[in-house]
Amino acid sequence: GPCAFMDEYHPATVFSSIDKQGRYAYANQPAILTWNLTRLAETLIPLINQDRKIAIASLTEVLQLIKPVYENYWLINMRSKIGLLKDDPKDYELINNLLQIMDEQNADFTLTFRFLSKTLIGNNKDVRSLFVNSDKFDAWLMLWQERVAQEEIPDEDIAKRMNEVNPIYIPRNHKVEEALDSAVNKNDIEPLSLLLSILVKPYEEIEGFELFTQPAPLSEVPYKTFCGT
């Protein structure tokens, strides 16, 4: 089905040209995961038990695990994106507060997390540039820095760890379109080869390839995809 990469962080982001109601919006992905697995479970009923009621009860028990398992792994992965390993009950709120600020200020999802690591080595400028009004972000940053201190690990090591899970390069939609247009309409696969050579090492920043880190120009937003893309 239609797929794409999100530039600015907005939970309501939808790329499919036919998804007018936002059924497959970014924020709805966990619910859609559950819906898809439930449909799969329905097809498995005859294979689980000859007694339909017993089969449904068994499958329901498994399906009820989806939400807590998803939420657990989401928190683990989001913690790693902001350089945290230790478990703190306040982390969920800390992460969601950042996401809310990003949503309000149209901050780029990929670059926010990548540039956040730079603050640990003295560069606050790059990440602050992603926010129209950085006051809220600055307040959040102070809370995050206090939390990072609890890790009891050198800042340089945390920054390195963050850069191993936060890519600098993703398949930006406008760059993918440029590569496809060149290959299909101009019989030139060089842009595609270049893009692929960068994407195979998404965590390694390459000097001179800054254009591949940038979101699409406003003239190419919103980006729409179609079934069969």
Language model feature labels by segment:
Residues 1-18:
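Flexible glycine/proline-rich, aromatic-decorated loop/lid segments
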Residues 17-229:
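Regulatory N- and C-terminal appendages and interdomain linkers associated
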